[in-house]
Design a protein with these regions (language model features):
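A broad, low-specificity signal marking well-ordered, structured residues that form hydrophobic/aromatic
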Residues: 12, 74, 87, 150
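Conserved short S/T/G-enriched processing/targeting/catalytic segments and their helical context
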Residues: 1-69, 95-131, 144-146, 156-167
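Hydrophobic beta-strand positions in blades of beta-propellers and related beta-sheet-rich domains
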Residues: 84-88, 152, 160
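Short hydrophobic alpha-helical segments used for membrane anchoring or interfacial signaling
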Residues: 76-79, 153-157
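Acidic, glycine-rich active-site loops and adjacent beta-strand->loop/helix elements
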Residues: 20, 80, 93, 135-137
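Short gly/pro-enriched beta-turn/loop segments at secondary-structure junctions
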Residues: 67-72, 80-84, 147
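Acidic-glycine-rich active-site phosphate/pyrophosphate-binding loop
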Residues: 76-92, 167
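Short arginine-rich
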Residues: 136-146
């Protein structure tokens, strides 16, 4: 069992799918890089900088020679002075800014069925949490590789906070 949702710092959180060991290593590296950058520059990184830094780490990980290639797909959510941001980071290191919602992993096709029919840009946080529960639960019921639990993190202008966990 691996927790697939991680808070990186006060401003950002990631989810991941793919190779657990690779994703865990990249998560540790991005946490350290964000802290180092903050110490060196005496300022927090913005969302675009964080996404590009994470994309670079992902890209470099697939270029490492290895007997066991690690492939990991990340979603990054966070906040900065410009607002709330969502990014999709593919296993090749490419970075895509997402305007509304995104899903990743083998169960994402099932989650998208729920998201595409029920998502509304004017939803409350409570409604959004219920939608995420439904989408992830749908994926869990139909895809054995999706895991066995639900973790929800809410990002708003005030905080990045875990709000729901079910095994």
């Amino acid at each position: 069992r691996a927790d697939k949702v991680h808070i990186l710092n006060d401003d950002f959180a990631v989810t991941w799918a793919g190779s657990v060991s690779e994703a865990q290593l990249i998560t540790k590296l991005i946490r350290a890089e964000l802290k180092l950058k903050e110490i060196r520059t005496n300022k927090k990184t913005n969302a675009k900088e964080t996404a590009n830094l994470l994309g670079g780490l992902i890209y470099s990980s697939i270029r490492r020679p290895s007997m066991l290639p690690g492939i990991a797909h990340f979603l990054l959510g966070g906040k900065d002075t410009d607002g709330i941001h969502l990014y999709d980071l593919f296993p090749d290191g490419s970075v895509t800014k997402i305007p509304d919602y995104v899903s990743s992993g083998s169960g994402s096709v099932f989650a998208y069925g729920v998201l595409e029919t029920k998502y509304n840009k004017d939803m409350t946080v409570k409604e959004g949490i219920e939608l995420v529960k439904l989408a992830v639960n749908t994926a869990l019921q139909r895809d054995s590789a999706s895991g066995n639990g639900i973790n929800i993190v809410v990002v708003n202008q005030n905080e990045v906070k875990k709000v729901y966990r079910k095994e």
